[in-house]
Amino acid sequence: PLMKELRKALSSGEIGEVRTLHADFGFKPKTREPEGRLLNPELAGGSLLDVGIYPLSLASMIMGKPKSFVSDWNRGSTGVDEQASCILKYDNGSMALLHSSLESETRQEAFISGTEGNIRIHKQCWKPQKMTITSRLSQKEKIVERPFVGNGFNYEAEFFGKLLLEGKTDNEIMSLEESLAIMSLLDQIRDSWGLRYPFE
């Protein structure tokens, strides 16, 4: 629900043209078994695919497809990325600075800076319920809250079910083309590190 409000705020021009996005998602797992899904290369483990996908998807939604990127990572004992950072650069010169970690808890927030203000998506930005919009144009700070029940995946399931009932195979909110572009970028980032899973 909050993502709808974010899209409205961005399209309204409240913060002007988006120039920078900072977003992170890091946590320290309670258990760190090498055989578990988080750290096991046989199960496509690592921070990028487990939690880094959320900041990356947010960047895609806000800024589109990047023209270039630079990235670095910390290889863990199982060979997967336990921590990673990525800078995405876009045709208009804007940038997204993204971070993921399975080594420590980060702020888990997103901060969108525009030419006329900014938007802070508060903690747990991958399932956001609160954002603060600060606009130099209106000289006001506005807090938008959209609480929800559950972990947020229920909204994805409901939306997908609605598409199926309508006989649709694509949609305007998250197109197949955008999904494939994000998957391709994830592969390119891992390629830049030299990280390949055993089944690839």
Where are these regions (language model features)?
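C-terminal helix-rich "cap/oligomerization" subdomain common to oxidoreductases
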Residues: 91, 162-200
